[in-house]
């Protein structure tokens, strides 16, 4: 019976395929546009606080916000600190 279903089944029409692809694209863009408007200012404020204590290059600070499962947000902060004189060989 499965063999008969295989030969008699109709292929998906192009409209349905296009709709599925469009839904995937929209979902990907929503995930990428989830960055809140306050994130650049937050990065600037964090950089100012760090610079009070350590001289660093602003490019060495990375702030990212990741959203998971709709109600969970993860703020990731990466700071590359310069080597201190004591730790150099």
UniProtKB/Swiss-Prot annotation:
Organism from which the protein derives: Klebsiella pneumoniae (strain 342)
Protein name: Cell division topological specificity factor
UniProt similarity note: Belongs to the MinE family.
Keywords: Cell cycle, Cell division
One Pfam family per UniProt: MinE
Matches recorded under HAMAP family: MinE
Main function: Prevents the cell division inhibition by proteins MinC and MinD at internal division sites while permitting inhibition at polar sites. This ensures cell division at the proper site by restricting the formation of a division septum at the midpoint of the long axis of the cell.
InterPro entries on file: MinE, MinE_sf
GO biological process, one term: regulation of division septum assembly
Disulfide bonds: none
Gene name as annotated: minE
NCBIfam families to which the protein is assigned, alphabetical: minE, PRK00296.1
């Amino acid at each position: 019976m499965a063999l008969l279903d295989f030969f008699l089944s109709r292929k998906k029409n192009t409209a349905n395929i296009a709709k599925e692809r469009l839904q995937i694209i929209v979902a990907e863009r929503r995930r990428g546009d989830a960055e809140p408007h306050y994130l650049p200012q937050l990065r600037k404020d964090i950089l100012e606080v760090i610079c009070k204590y350590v001289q660093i290059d602003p490019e060495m600070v990375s702030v990212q916000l990741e959203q998971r499962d709709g109600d969970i947000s993860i703020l990731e902060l990466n700071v590359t600190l310069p080597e201190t004189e004591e730790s150099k060989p």
